[in-house]
C-alpha cells in the first residue's frame, strides 16, 4: 500500500475514535450534590443524560424510603418534583439512567428548613411610663430549631439575645420566643423595638436567612396633675356667669369630662369639653363640680365648689368716679341700678348749681348728657337711685381741660455748627395750665424742662412757651428735637395727657478747608493748558464759585464748576484767581496766583551815536525787549579768546572814549524762564587822522578790511532778518553759511 494511503487511513481512524469518545454516555443532576428547600415550598430535581437517544430513568432514596414526589420523564431528561416539601423529603436522592448495557447514577442530598414568617412582637400590656412591661418576640414554625438565634433591640440598644443551639433535634415545626422585661421612660417615645430572628443555614439566601419585625414604641402616661381654673371667682352673684377650665397631663392627651356631684354622690355629666361655662346662675347652681381627665390607661380628677349668692342692690356710675372732659366735647354720665327691677333716678351737682345737661331715664339706667362742655360744667355730680324703701347715691367728678393741639417748635435761624441758636416750644390753648409741664429734648438729652405749677389757676385758655438756647454740633445731625407737653390731671388719670412734636436736626457746617490744586503748575508758558480745581468741606456740600480778582480788588465771577480750565493760556490770563465755597452757613475763600510766562520777542539792539565811531567818542549800546517786562538782558562782546559779559544797566552799556580795541561784534541775549532770543551788531572804531598825504599801513589794512566788511554786513542783515522770523540769530552760523 502506498505511504500516502496509509497516512490517510490512519488519520481517519483517529478522527473516528475522537468522535466516538465525544459522544460517550454521560449523566448530570441539578442542583448538584446538595440543595435545601423550605417546608411547604415546591422543589424540582432534574436528571439529564447525553450520548443516549432513549435512556431509561429511575429515582429512589438512598435508604429506599418512599419518594413522596412525582416523576416526569421526557426524552433525555427526568424531573422529580416535591410539592409541597415536607419532612419526608429530607433524603439523599439517586437518579439512575440506563442506555443499552450502560448504567449511570448520580445522587443529591435534600435538606429542609422552615422559616416562613417574620417574628411577632407581643406586650404584656400597654407601655406606661414608670411601670414594668414584658415584651415577647416570637419566631413561629421554625425548623431546625437548633440553628435559630433571636435578638431584641430597643433603638440601637441590644436588650437580649438567645441562641437555641442546645435544643434537641426533632422533626417538627416549633415556635420559639425571647422575653424581656423593661420599664418604659418618656424618652422611649418614637424609638423602634426590633425583633430579629436568624436561621444559620449556609445554603439559604441571605434575604431568607434573617427576618425582623419593627414596632414603634407608643409610651403612655396615665392622667395626672388635673387642675381647674375658675373665672371670675368661685363665689358668684345671682345672675352672673362663670367659666371653668380644666387641664390634665397625660399621654395620649386625656379627654376632659365635666360633671356635678348630686346629693347621692352620683356624678351628673355636664360636658365633654375642657371649658365649662355657666350663665345666668341661680342659687341652686351652687355645688361641687368635678373635672375628670381620662385616657387609655387611667383617669384623674379634680373638684371645685361654686357658691352662688343672692344678687344685691348696687348703684354704678360710668365712665367712672372721675371724668376728664375737653372743652367743647360732649360728656355722657350713665347711672345704673343693679339688683332692682324698677328704680327711680335723680341728678344734682354737689353745690346745687344748674345741671346744664339733659337727663334721660330708661329702665334700670339714667343718662346725663352735657353738650359742648365749658368751664361752668366743672362739678361733682350725684346720681340718687331709689329702690323700694332704699336709696343709694353715687358721685362722679367732671374735670374740664383743654389740650387740643400738638406743641409747635420754632428756631431763631438755621442750625450751624458752633453757632448758638434759640429754640422755643409753644403749647397753645391750655387749661388748666398750672398742671402743664413742657420738656425740650435733643435726642435723649433734656435741654430744658419747666412746670407751670406756680402760675395762678384762672379759668381761661392760655398759650405757654418754653425757650432755650443751645450750640449745635455736627454730631446733632440725625438726632431729633422733641417738644413734649404733659397735662397732669391729678388723681383723675394714672398717666398724664401727652402731646409732642418732633423736628429732625440737620446741622449745617460752614465751608472750610477750601483747597486749590493747579495742574500742571501755577507758572506756565503762554499757550499751555491749565486746570484749576477747587474743593471745600461743609454741610451741605458747598457750592463752588470761581472769580478773578481785578486791580481794584473786586471779584469778577467766572465759573460755578469745581474745575476752571484754560485750554490755551495768554499773557493776559496772569493774575489772582479766587475760589469760594458757599453754603447756607457761610463762605470759605482761597486764592492762587497764575503766572503766564512769554518767550522774549521784538528784541532791539541799538548803538548810539552810530555803528561807526571815531576813537575817543562816547558810545552807548542798548538792548531792549518790548513784549516781556520781566526778562534778563545780557550784553556780551565776542572775542576769539572767549565772550566777555559787559556790565550793563537796564540793558545799556556805555563806552567812554572809545578805543580801537572796542571795535568788534556785540551780542545781546534776552532771557526768560521759558526761552531766549539773540541780537548782534558790529561796532567800528576809527583811528584819529594826522596827515592827509600819509597813507599808513594800518589805514591800508583798514581799507582792505572795510572792503570785506560791507558784503559781510549785508549777509548779517540777511541772516538777522531770517533769524527774526525764526525767533533767534547766531552770527557764527551766519558766517559759516557765508563761507
From Swiss-Prot:
<dbReference type="InterPro" id="IPR003987">
    <property type="entry name" value="ICAM_VCAM_N"/>
</dbReference>
<dbReference type="InterPro" id="IPR013783">
    <property type="entry name" value="Ig-like_fold"/>
</dbReference>
<feature type="domain" description="Ig-like C2-type 1">
    <location>
        <begin position="25"/>
        <end position="111"/>
    </location>
</feature>
<dbReference type="GO" id="GO:0005576">
    <property type="term" value="C:extracellular region"/>
</dbReference>
<comment type="subunit">
    <text>(Microbial infection) Interacts with ECMV-D capsid proteins and acts as a receptor for this virus.</text>
</comment>
<dbReference type="GO" id="GO:0071333">
    <property type="term" value="P:cellular response to glucose stimulus"/>
</dbReference>
<feature type="domain" description="Ig-like C2-type 6">
    <location>
        <begin position="511"/>
        <end position="595"/>
    </location>
</feature>
<keyword id="KW-0945">Host-virus interaction</keyword>
<dbReference type="GO" id="GO:0071944">
    <property type="term" value="C:cell periphery"/>
</dbReference>
<keyword id="KW-0472">Membrane</keyword>
<dbReference type="InterPro" id="IPR008424">
    <property type="entry name" value="Ig_C2-set"/>
</dbReference>
<feature type="glycosylation site" description="N-linked (GlcNAc...) asparagine">
    <location>
        <position position="424"/>
    </location>
</feature>
<dbReference type="InterPro" id="IPR003599">
    <property type="entry name" value="Ig_sub"/>
</dbReference>
<dbReference type="GO" id="GO:0007155">
    <property type="term" value="P:cell adhesion"/>
</dbReference>
<protein>
    <recommendedName>
        <fullName>Vascular cell adhesion protein 1</fullName>
    </recommendedName>
</protein>
<feature type="topological domain" description="Cytoplasmic">
    <location>
        <begin position="721"/>
        <end position="739"/>
    </location>
</feature>
<feature type="glycosylation site" description="N-linked (GlcNAc...) asparagine">
    <location>
        <position position="561"/>
    </location>
</feature>
<comment type="function">
    <text>Cell adhesion glycoprotein predominantly expressed on the surface of endothelial cells that plays an important role in immune surveillance and inflammation. Acts as a major regulator of leukocyte adhesion to the endothelium through interaction with different types of integrins. During inflammatory responses, binds ligands on the surface of activated endothelial cells to initiate the activation of calcium channels and the plasma membrane-associated small GTPase RAC1 leading to leukocyte transendothelial migration.</text>
</comment>
<dbReference type="InterPro" id="IPR003989">
    <property type="entry name" value="VCAM-1"/>
</dbReference>
<dbReference type="GO" id="GO:0061032">
    <property type="term" value="P:visceral serous pericardium development"/>
</dbReference>
<feature type="disulfide bond">
    <location>
        <begin position="246"/>
        <end position="291"/>
    </location>
</feature>
<dbReference type="GO" id="GO:0016324">
    <property type="term" value="C:apical plasma membrane"/>
</dbReference>
<dbReference type="GO" id="GO:0005178">
    <property type="term" value="F:integrin binding"/>
</dbReference>
<dbReference type="InterPro" id="IPR047012">
    <property type="entry name" value="ICAM_VCAM"/>
</dbReference>
<feature type="topological domain" description="Extracellular">
    <location>
        <begin position="25"/>
        <end position="698"/>
    </location>
</feature>
<dbReference type="InterPro" id="IPR003598">
    <property type="entry name" value="Ig_sub2"/>
</dbReference>
<dbReference type="GO" id="GO:0007159">
    <property type="term" value="P:leukocyte cell-cell adhesion"/>
</dbReference>
<feature type="signal peptide">
    <location>
        <begin position="1"/>
        <end position="24"/>
    </location>
</feature>
<keyword id="KW-0677">Repeat</keyword>
<keyword id="KW-0325">Glycoprotein</keyword>
<feature type="domain" description="Ig-like C2-type 3">
    <location>
        <begin position="223"/>
        <end position="309"/>
    </location>
</feature>
<feature type="glycosylation site" description="N-linked (GlcNAc...) asparagine">
    <location>
        <position position="273"/>
    </location>
</feature>
<dbReference type="InterPro" id="IPR013098">
    <property type="entry name" value="Ig_I-set"/>
</dbReference>
<feature type="disulfide bond">
    <location>
        <begin position="335"/>
        <end position="383"/>
    </location>
</feature>
<feature type="domain" description="Ig-like C2-type 4">
    <location>
        <begin position="312"/>
        <end position="393"/>
    </location>
</feature>
<feature type="disulfide bond">
    <location>
        <begin position="47"/>
        <end position="95"/>
    </location>
</feature>
<dbReference type="Pfam" id="PF07679">
    <property type="entry name" value="I-set"/>
</dbReference>
<keyword id="KW-0964">Secreted</keyword>
<keyword id="KW-0812">Transmembrane</keyword>
<keyword id="KW-1003">Cell membrane</keyword>
<feature type="disulfide bond">
    <location>
        <begin position="137"/>
        <end position="195"/>
    </location>
</feature>
<keyword id="KW-0130">Cell adhesion</keyword>
